[in-house]
Amino acid sequence: MSVRQESVGQATAARSRARAVAPPEIREHRIPTQGSKPYIAMEGFDGGLWFCESGTSKIGRFDPKRASFTEFAIPTPNATPIGITVGGDGNYWFAEKTGNKIGRVTPRGEFTEFALPTPNAGPDGILLGPDGNVWFSETEVSRIGRITPDGTITEFKDGITPGGKPLSFSQRDGALWFSEAAGNCIGRIAMDGTVTEFPIPSHDSQPRATIAHPDGSIWFVETSTNALGRVDRAGKIVEYKVTTPNASLRGVAVGPDGDLWFTENFANKIGRMAPDGGMLGEYEIPTPASGARCITAMSNGRLYFTQWDAGLIGEVIPR
């Protein structure tokens, strides 16, 4: 499949003039347990924000209406949970990077854990697939795993760049798309395990978070090259520079307005980009050096992001 080789500079010059937007309000909520190091977060079945506490081996839930937290301790100590997703069974599934397990937790906080067949696989990203199974990345061994609701695990390695370090997933066209942080590409895995890779034009871009856009494209952050990338339906990749140099982009989400909202770890800002690549703004996070990581949009029209270093959940209210 062909890949559009358009540089970051070309894409920046080609974008339309960005529209004027009002800055959002940013609020912060402190997680009760000190040293929680929140990582991936997503909206649950109940309208709460469910997230992994990588520093304290817990699964957290934030109630947006009451601004309150509930925390559930994972049975395995020092499991380092990273990714979390809703399952087709009404439960939540998560990846234990150090524990080398896939965990399942009910809405009431009851846990089941499944050990991975490959030692030190380093499971990271995780997402419910269109086939009803949960898929996850095995970052340290460059494989993609699949777990059925009853706990049967299958691993796929063919077609993935050796040492590519797959990370984040998004769903499109009946398949899952994923980033390869060391492989410098975006991958696509069909439900039969067939993998296709799409090289990113910029060298050593370190793609991380991905998100599916309603227009059918897949967006991703490039941590090393300070840009957002876009994969269209034909597999062509275009990259768009962000304004602040060396911002260290980590998470990306599609807001209720269709814009791309993203976290800037080093710059300690929340960025906003139009779907045509035009920068709309960058907004300071109140807490300095907060360690902004994942950002996710919720059905209440707001976005929430994790602050790994500060132990906070950030709330973005677009205006």
Q: Over which residues does each language-model region extend?
A:
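Conserved beta-strand positions in repeat-built beta-propeller and related beta-rich domains
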Residues: 51-55, 92-98, 134-140, 178-182, ...
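A short helix->beta-strand "capping" segment at the edge of beta-propeller domains
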Residues: 17-34
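Beta-rich, blade/repeat-based domains predominating
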Residues: 34-46, 77-89, 119-131, 161-173, ...
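A short loop-to-beta-strand structural motif that recurs across blades of beta-propeller domains
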Residues: 58-61, 100-103, 142-145, 184-187, ...
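A short beta-strand motif characteristic of beta-propeller blades
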Residues: 27-31, 70-74, 111-116, 153-158, ...
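Blade-level signature of beta-propeller repeat domains, shared across WD40, Kelch, NHL, RCC1
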Residues: 291-319
